[in-house]
Amino acid sequence: IIEELRCESNKGFKLIPPFEIVISRNKVVVDLGTLTDAYEKEITIHTTATSKDGEKTILAGKDVTIIDTVKLDGLKKGTKYQLKGWQMLKEENAELIINNKRVENDYTFVADAEAMKVEIAYTFNASALGGKSLVTFEELYDLSNPEEPVKVAEHKDIDDDGQTVLITERI
């Protein structure tokens, strides 16, 4: 059996599936030709964070919701994925913690197309966040093996305006 192993030089490539060769005569040379790996399609994430109304500003309050619309491209049809996201305080470049817990959410789905759009909602108490900018970060995991999820993409740009929502103070 000939099996290609993952290493630095084939990173980003789809491995050749293992195959078996049976040689039944002595002193025979078997020419396998050139075995090449195909490029693995890279998964990309593009996101837009807004209020429920599609606005980039939200009035501070006890029950604030940010909707994160995530466009994914390069998915493998039929594969189970989990999208994990959380809120960051832009000015501090730190996770948003409320009541000793990170403001986070996740969404698990099976890809029915190579390109998909999904939404994650974050609802939390933003009473004390007037004047703060919040940025949504995401990581996408392949759950083909539920025992060992594999991170396949991430979008963590603290300066991305598309991922940023401003919490305004009540007047």
Question: Which residues does each predicted region cover?
Answer:
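Solvent-exposed loop/turn and edge beta-strand elements of beta-rich ligand-binding domains
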Residues: I1-I171
